A protein has these predicted regions:
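Alpha-helical transmembrane segments and immediately membrane-proximal extracytoplasmic
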Residues: 1-431
Length: 431
């Protein structure tokens, strides 16, 4: 009996050492990622906050001085020159996404390039967003931090996602959505949970840093939210289906304009000048500056006041496609918010549901349609609009995700699992 007990003791001690070693490894790994996440959140938070402040300044200046809009061709020429000179291989957000699945790096020069070029685009009134630029900015900085700390390839991929989340959170003030977005957008159908802790921590720190820097988080007050019934639920399904259709049209418009530019305007300098002239003519014809920049003013009117002109969504879609595919920089995410909010708002005239809730749900639904990120879309709706209309947002996002098919803003986004059955398909989005 004593011999048996004596034999068990070394085995128990061995098992104890085994578990202690694993706990030590896990704790070391956790501490490593906490430190890296804090550093990423602070560094990306600072750069992104500075980016947001400068962006706000140039936007306000352009709003007060309409003549700046006529400098759009000049801004475009500067942007083309910068990318021809320093960043010919820069692939924008697509390059950041492909980096996470490959051995490639995000060039550090992407950070100053996207910073300056987005500022120039917004200064002159191009129809572009800012989150796309922030994602590239954060991904570039995150990758560079990973290189400085001599991290291996897999860890650098996590650092890219960490930087993306931090930048998105700092610029838009939605840490929950930002933390999930970078893990969800790369491969639809799977989540990179290895990045959960660093993305969450970096996102929160960057958001708080930005708030201390004077960057107020975006939020909108949704009014007149009706009780969810079978009737109102079915009406929201119609809104979601319509927004999914518009999301497909938006993606097709971006691709179509890109092909037209490539066919008829091969020289990038001529292309951006010609596109600027077209944008200026359309804007003067419409006699409004509402479609310049990201479109926050139209979102606010649609969501909080239930006001949108019948063709607001159309002109924002057209001008964004003309701007972004000409070579201007910024991103399509906030314009997609604007298109969804204004289109959802006018759906009220067809279905008789509150224009405010239609605008809010339409914004989330269209964002989901173009990014294929339903969890992020739900979270961003909660953070921007609160939880009172949660049921409507859930309906809108889920229906839009299913109906929008395999279209998307990013050609390097991979659809790993089918949207319609538990089936591995591993295909790229239709772009």
């Amino acid at each position: 009996m004593n011999n048996t007990q004596d034999k068990k003791k070394p085995e128990e001690i061995h098992n104890l050492h085994y578990y202690i070693d694993h706990i030590r490894y896990d704790m070391t790994n956790l501490i490593k990622w906490l430190v890296l996440a804090v550093l990423t959140g602070l560094s990306v938070g600072f750069i992104s906050s500075l980016f947001a402040r400068v962006l706000k300044f140039v936007t306000n200046y352009r709003t007060e001085h309409f003549w700046v809009f006529f400098l759009l061709p000049v801004s475009g020429l500067i942007i083309v020159f910068l990318y021809q000179k320093f960043g010919q291989e820069d692939g924008g957000t697509n390059q950041v996404l492909s980096t996470i699945r490959s051995q490639d790096d995000v060039p550090f020069r992407s950070a100053p390039l996207i910073f300056v070029s987005t500022i120039l685009t917004h200064f002159a009134g191009g129809s572009a967003g800012r989150e796309g630029a922030a994602i590239q900015l954060g991904g570039s900085i995150g990758n560079q931090l990973g290189s400085w700390f001599h991290l291996d390839e897999e860890d650098r991929h996590v650092m890219v996602m960490c930087g993306m989340s931090a930048a998105f959170s700092a610029v838009f003030g939605t840490p929950m959505a930002a933390a999930v977005f970078s893990m969800e957008v790369v491969s639809v159908g799977i989540m990179y949970y290895a990045a959960l802790v660093p993305c969450v921590i970096a996102s929160i720190i960057a958001s708080k840093f930005a708030a201390g820097f004077g960057i107020n988080p975006e939020s909108f007050h949704v009014v007149n939210i009706p009780e969810l019934t079978i009737e109102t639920g079915l009406k929201m399904v119609l809104v979601a289906i319509a927004c999914a259709a518009i999301s497909i049209i938006f993606c097709m418009a971006l691709q179509g304009v890109s092909k037209l530019y490539a066919k008829f305007l091969k020289n990038p300098y001529i292309r951006i000048v010609a596109a600027s002239a077209i944008i200026i003519v359309i804007t003067l014809f419409l006699r409004t500056s509402d479609y310049m920049g990201a479109g926050n003013n139209l979102i606010e009117l649609a969501v909080e006041n239930g006001q949108a002109r019948p063709l607001d969504f159309f002109w924002k879609l057209v001008l964004t496609a003309l701007t972004m595919r000409a070579g201007f920089r910024g991103g399509e995410i906030v314009p997609s918010f604007c298109i969804g909010a204004t289109f959802g708002c006018i759906m009220e005239h067809l279905i008789g549901l509150s224009p405010s809730i239609c605008a809010a749900a339409g914004m989330a639904a269209l964002f989901c349609g173009v990014t294929n990120c339903p969890i992020t879309s739900i979270l961003i709706a909660f953070e921007l609009f609160g939880f009172r209309g949660a049921s409507y947002y859930l309906i809108a996002v889920s229906i839009s995700y299913a109906v929008s098919g395999y279209y998307g803003l990013y050609k390097d986004q991979t659809i790993v699992y089918s949207k319609y059955k538990a089936k591995y398909i591993n295909r790229h989005t239709r772009f």
